[in-house]
């Protein structure tokens, strides 16, 4: 029996990676015709349009090269093939409840009919519901893994035992050379312990350990935990262009980011304005477009979360001044396509719900003099197409150690004991996702 498998791809895979068809080694890749139609429908989508157009261009290039796509053509360098499947659409092979006119049913019919012919079929999708449906009709299904990274669980913090003399030197000189810290990623926060003394530092771009002072503040906010102090130190460092703040709900991610932004705009005047982008997903993955009202009315609940945080950090007079002078914008991510953000302190809130390509698009919009902060909690992904090993997690692993990038996972909850208790209970109930 041949080891060659047949992989049926759905639209979500090609929107995630337009070059996916060439990444299945020696195996056969099948794209149902309905996927081409779905790509066509996404050509002008505010976030996914570029990826849809790129995938369609690649199919057109293959058409020009090979003449037709309804028969297997070679792709990649390892003997794999690709074809667009026009047949195998008969839904009779599916259970009665799945014989609908939906695109999902058409994709399932294609995969099931190929499997009925004896092929070793796997349906590949980034869409959780479609993978569940495939399993329900007896088909093998898998997530698209070609873009996955091995998530190391890197928190951005490290603990080192050292001599008390090193700690004294760090306080005296503000920076020391520690052999044990040279192999740590750039901007890693370090808890130094030795001889009854302790200090907090971080690895700088020169692989030296610089002191993180506990009295640093941004717009009146000081870090309470070691992680928050390191995060604040990074947020106030203009040389770090991308700062990633992870952590559970209530650990202070948004507060730190907003205070750093207001400090940059109002106090230091290094940036013109703070721009907060939020993805258009509600709890459960509902897109904003399904809600009634104008765009501003739809954005109300999303923007209010930012204003609630600000109200706890600044007086009403300061908040009114910031808004009246246009120093703060809260926008849906749909507004970032085609923009170049110059001299802006950009905050991408709830970044865990963004697919990697969308997140990279956001980062590519940064213009001269701009910085970006990503706040995220991997456990609260509302976009069902984002897994634990892609999206912001993949970006962190790829950028880890670069002098322009820093990441810190915040651990201590700053909300009420009730909120902290409920967060822990929910994690115990749902388990890892």
UniProtKB/Swiss-Prot annotation:
Activity regulation field: ATPase activity is partially inhibited by ADP, GTPase activity is partially inhibited by GDP. Both activities are inhibited by commercially available compounds ML141 and NAV2729.
Induction notes from the record: Part of the phoAT-phoH2 operon.
pH dependence comment: Optimum pH is 7.4-8.0.
Catalytically driven reaction(s): n ATP + n H2O + wound RNA = n ADP + n phosphate + unwound RNA; ATP + H2O = ADP + phosphate + H(+); GTP + H2O = GDP + phosphate + H(+)
Assembly and binders: Interacts with antitoxin PhoAT.
Similarity-based family: In the N-terminal section; belongs to the PINc/VapC protein family. In the C-terminal section; belongs to the PhoH family.
EC number(s) stated in the UniProt entry for this protein: 3.1.-.-, 5.6.2.5
Name of protein: Protein PhoH2
Any one GO CC term of the record: cytosol
The PINc domain, residue ranges: 5-132
One GO MF term: nuclease activity
Tree of life domain: Bacteria
Function, in words: Toxic component of a type II toxin-antitoxin (TA) system. The cognate antitoxin is PhoAT; expression in M.smegmatis (strain mc(2)155) requires the cognate M.tuberculosis antitoxin gene. Expression in M.smegmatis strain mc(2)155 of the toxin alone slows growth and reduces cell viability, effects which are abrogated when cognate antitoxin PhoAT is coexpressed. Unwinds and/or cleaves 5'-tailed RNA in vitro that starts with 5'-AC, the reaction requires hydrolyzable ATP; double-stranded (ds)RNA and dsDNA are not unwound or cleaved. Can be expressed in the absence of its antitoxin gene in E.coli.
Pfam family, one: PhoH
Temperature dependency: Optimum temperature is 25-37 degrees Celsius for ATP and GTP hydolysis.
Keyword tags: ATP-binding, GTP-binding, Hydrolase, Isomerase, Magnesium, Metal-binding, Nuclease, Nucleotide-binding, Toxin-antitoxin system
Signal sequence range: none
Domain notes: Has an N-terminal PINc domain and a C-terminal PhoH domain, suggesting it has RNase and nucleotide hydrolysis activities.
Keyword Nuclease recorded: yes
SUPFAM superfamilies: P-loop containing nucleoside triphosphate hydrolases, PIN domain-like
Species name: Mycobacterium tuberculosis (strain ATCC 25618 / H37Rv)
Keyword set includes Oxidoreductase: no
Required cofactor(s): Mg(2+)
């Amino acid at each position: 029996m041949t080891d060659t498998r047949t992989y049926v791809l759905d639209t979500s895979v090609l929107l995630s990676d337009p070059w996916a068809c060439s990444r299945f080694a020696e195996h056969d890749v099948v794209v149902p015709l309905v996927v081409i139609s779905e790509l066509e429908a996404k050509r002008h989508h505010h976030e996914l349009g570029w990826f849809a157009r790129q995938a369609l261009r690649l199919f057109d290039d293959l058409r020009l090269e090979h003449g037709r796509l309804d028969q297997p053509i070679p792709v990649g360098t390892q003997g794999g093939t690709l074809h667009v499947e026009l047949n195998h659409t008969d839904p009779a092979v599916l259970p009665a409840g799945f014989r609908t006119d939906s695109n999902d049913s058409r994709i399932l019919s294609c995969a099931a009919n190929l499997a009925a012919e004896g092929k070793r079929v796997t349906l590949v999708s980034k869409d959780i519901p479609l993978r569940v449906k495939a399993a329900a009709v007896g088909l093998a299904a898998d997530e698209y893994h070609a873009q996955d990274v091995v998530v190391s669980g890197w928190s951005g913090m490290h603990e080192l035992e050292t001599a008390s003399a090193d700690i004294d030197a760090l306080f005296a000189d503000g920076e020391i050379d520690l052999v044990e810290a040279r192999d740590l990623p750039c901007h890693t926060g370090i808890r130094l312990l030795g001889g009854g003394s302790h200090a907090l530092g971080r690895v700088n771009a020169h692989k030296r350990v610089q002191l993180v002072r506990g009295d640093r503040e941004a717009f009146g906010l000081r870090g309470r935990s070691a992680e928050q102090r390191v995060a604040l130190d990074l947020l106030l460092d203009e040389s770090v262009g991308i700062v990633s703040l992870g952590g559970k709900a209530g650990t202070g991610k948004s507060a730190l980011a907003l205070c750093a932004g207001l400090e940059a705009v109002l106090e230091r005047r290094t940036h013109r304005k703070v721009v907060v982008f939020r993805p258009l997903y509600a709890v459960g993955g509902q897109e904003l477009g399904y809600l009634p009202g104008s765009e501003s009315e739809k954005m109300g609940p999303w923007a209010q979360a930012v204003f609630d945080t600000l109200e706890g950090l600044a007086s009403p007079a300061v908040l009114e001044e910031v808004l009246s002078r246009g120093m703060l914008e809260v926008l849906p991510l749909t507004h970032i396509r085609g923009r170049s953000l110059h001299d802006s302190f950009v905050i991408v809130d709830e970044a865990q719900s963004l697919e990697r390509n969308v997140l990279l698009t956001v980062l590519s919009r940064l213009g001269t003099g701009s910085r970006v902060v990503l706040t995220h909690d991997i456990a609260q992904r509302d976009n069902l197409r984002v897994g634990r090993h892609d999206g912001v997690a993949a970006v962190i692993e790829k950028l880890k150690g670069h002098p322009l990038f820093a990441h810190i996972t915040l651990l201590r909850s700053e909300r009420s004991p009730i909120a902290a208790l409920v967060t822990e209970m929910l994690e115990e109930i749902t388990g890892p996702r």
